[in-house]
Structure formats: structure tokens, C-alpha cells
Amino acid sequence: MKNILFISGFLILISIQSSFAQSSLDDEIILIQSSFGMDKKQIIEGYMDLPESIAPSFWSIYQAYEAERTMLARERMNIINDFLTEYDKIGNDEANDLAKRTLKNDLELSKLHSAYYKKFKKATSALDAAKFMQIDTYIHNTIRNAMQQELPFIDQ
């Protein structure tokens, strides 16, 4: 399972890197999120292996969750883009702004997870809700870590 997730994440990163030179930031974000959403859903569907009796409720909540999470991912990409654009001239004000925006984005993602954990638990079970949160967090942390490795450190 880890190999499938790593390969999926790696392929997404390759498409991210090649698409940055081809279109505007918003077009790239839409392209990445639409292709990632399909791959991610397939991974989650295979991992969750939900019974037919609860699958429709789960996927309905999942769609709403993904819509909100995608907006947070879009903001994260904007923060990264701003960092890369301003990298050569980052001073105290720019660093402060980027740090505050990143912390706010992290907090909003935690709030989203908390709110949707309750919804998933109500529609399925605590076990299924925890299982979803675990795989979702794993997927996104894998991708975030791979992206972070490509970013330069401030003032280096």
C-alpha cells in the first residue's frame, strides 16, 4: 500500500513540476487537484473497502470534505508560489506574512479534519472514520514532505 501511495505521490509531483512552466497558477492548481482527486479517491476506495450499506453516505461526505480540503490545498499552493516568487527578497515582513499564512492554513486543515471526523463517524463508525483520517493524512503528508524537500530554506 505504501508503494502505491508513494508512486502516486511521485507521479503527481512530476506532473506539478512539468505543468508549472505551461500555464498560470490557477490553471495548474485546478489541473493538479482534478487529477489528484481521481487518483486519491481510487486509493481511498480500495483501502476503505466499505460495505454497500454505508458506502453512499461515506462518499457523499467525502465529496463535501474534498471540496473544502481542495480550497485549503489551493491556498497552500498559493503560499508556496508566493514563497518561491519572493525568495530572493524575503525580509522580516515577508517571512512574517508567509509564516502566519502557513500557520493559519495548518489550523484550518486541523479544524476541517475535526469537523469531518465527526461526520464520517456518524455516517459509518469510529473505526471507519479513523481509518479514513489516517489514510488521508498519510497521502497528504507524503506529498507535502516530497514538495518540502524541493523548496529552498529561507536565507540559504
What does each of the following model-derived ranges do?
Residues M1-D27:
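Bacterial Sec-dependent N-terminal signal peptides
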Residues E28-L31, S35, Y47, S110-Q156:
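Amphipathic, charged alpha-helical segments and their helix-to-coil junctions
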Residues I29-I30, I43-A123:
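Amphipathic alpha-helical segments
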Residues Q17, E66-R69, H140-I143:
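A short hydrophobic/aromatic micro-motif that marks alpha-helical segments and, especially, helix-coil
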Residues M38:
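Active-site-adjacent substrate/metal-binding segments within catalytic domains
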Residues L5-F6, S18, N96, A126, ...:
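Hydrophobic alpha-helical segments
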